[in-house]
Amino acid sequence: MPGVVFDLDGTLVHSAPDIHAAVNRALAEEGAEPFSLAEITGFIGNGVPVLIKRVLAARGETPDGHRHAEMQDRFMKHYEADPTALTSVYPGAEAALRHLHSEGWRIALCTNKPYAASRQILSNFGILDLFDAIVGGDCLPQRKPDPAPLRAAAAALTEEVVLYVGDSEVDAATAEAAGLRFALFTEGYRHAPVHDLPHHGLFSHHDELPDLLRHLLA
């Protein structure tokens, strides 16, 4: 059977509420005003270092390396304490994963979220055992949209045909750069209109995913 690689945030899980809470807890420690959920959701997609850079820039800061590292460490302290307190698996996502797994698909994760937090999220939701490989944002020097992490995840599956499933501009660009067919989840953290993102198929509910992936193999 072929392989499939999934993004995490905005694709399998709605994690923005926990990311939002951790950012605001980190800011509260220095007496700063909180951000709205919509603002933080708009900062998600390129990994924690870029998230923190965007948070600080939105506050009018141009941080040096020390300030950025300090804020990132504070954020991660709060986030890793419980990354699933407010996070939820998208409806139908677990069932789709289990269906694909039962059919013999090999499944990997490629995310810009750090490896440990990604693994903890999958474990907390009882789906870690469905994944054959995880490539997190701190596993390689490169992060998406550089194709290296996706290529590493695909290579770990050792299948001739590998598809990629994601929700954002970053995911679409990564798939295109890696030369993989891309299935776009339309209900995640995308900013641009669907037609602006290169994709080979799209879905709005994970119930549709197994049939879509089979169609992309045809």
Curated annotation (Swiss-Prot):
Gene Ontology cellular component terms for the protein in this record: cytosol
Pathway: Organic acid metabolism; glycolate biosynthesis; glycolate from 2-phosphoglycolate: step 1/1
UniProt record, GO biological process: DNA repair; glycolate biosynthetic process; reductive pentose-phosphate cycle
Active-site residues annotated for this sequence: 7
Reaction(s) catalysed by this chain's protein: 2-phosphoglycolate + H2O = glycolate + phosphate
Needed co-factor(s): Mg(2+)
Family as reported in the entry's similarity comment: Belongs to the HAD-like hydrolase superfamily. CbbY/CbbZ/Gph/YieH family.
Protein name, as recorded: Phosphoglycolate phosphatase
Organism the protein comes from: Cereibacter sphaeroides (strain ATCC 17025 / ATH 2.4.3) (Rhodobacter sphaeroides)
